Regions:
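Structural motif
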Residues: 3, 51, 144-145
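Structural preference for beta-strand elements that scaffold enzyme active sites
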Residues: 6-7, 54-58, 88-92, 126-128, ...
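Glycine-rich phosphate-binding active-site loops on the catalytic face of alpha/beta enzymes
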Residues: 7-18, 88, 95-97, 101-103, ...
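Conserved anion-binding
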Residues: 12-103
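C-terminal helical cap(s) of enzyme catalytic domains, especially alpha/beta-barrels
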Residues: 22-34, 156-178
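Glycine/Thr-rich beta-alpha phosphate-binding loop at enzyme active sites
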Residues: 95-126, 133, 161-163, 167
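Glycine-rich beta-to-alpha transition loops that act as phosphate-gripper elements at the mouths
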Residues: 129-135, 154-155
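Catalytic cores of alpha/beta
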Residues: 132-147
């Protein structure tokens, strides 16, 4: 906050995965590790808020967790948001199973189902989509009433993978319907 930052990203799937790996080395795995990671992230959220930052809190399920998505996402929300100022939190949903080159993106009914669940579980917090908002799905994502925006890290997921400003602007235009 002292450097002019207003918000921070906490709990990105890669961050969660790194923390799970550290816990696995210590012999903690499965649900116990997932809950421990959410408790660590909860402390990160509290520290960020104490510093005056708004938090973009990422949640998501892996392919092997899809059948149990309600419990997985519910625990991430309940533990991660315990005792925090929810007025200063936005939820970023990352369907981990669908992120990356060659993966099948989550479809509109699935994303809608998850966003409704998150809003119901959190008392209506804003939900942004973090599972690959790109040119070919921006309009579809914008058409989901329960989605309040998107998280864009890369603009190109194949070939020359990376972030390209012109493509970023095109994604925004398509999301806004322009």
């Amino acid at each position: 906050a002292q450097m002019g930052c207003a918000s921070t990203l906490i709990g990105h799937c890669e961050e969660r995965n790194d923390k799970m790996g550290i816990l696995a080395e210590a012999g903690v795995t499965g649900q116990a590790a997932a809950q421990a990671v959410s408790r660590i992230l909860n402390q990160e959220i509290k520290c960020a808020q104490a510093a005056g930052l708004t938090v973009l809190y990422c949640i998501g399920e892996k392919s092997e967790e899809q059948a149990d998505w309600e419990n997985v996402l519910g625990a991430q929300l309940d533990i991660g948001l315990d005792g925090v100022d929810k007025r200063r939190v936005v939820i970023a949903y990352e369907p981990i199973w669908s992120i990356g080159p060659g993966k099948t993106p989550a479809d509109k009914p699935y994303i809608t189902k998850i966003a409704r669940f998150v809003k119901a579980r959190t008392g209506g917090l804003d939900v942004v989509y973090g599972g690959g908002l790109k040119q070919d799905n921006a309009a579809m994502l914008a058409s989901i009433d329960e989605i309040d925006g998107g998280l864009i890290a890369l603009t190109r997921f194949s070939g020359e993978i990376g972030f390209y400003p012109d493509e970023y602007l095109d994604i925004i235009r398509r999301y806004l319907g322009k």
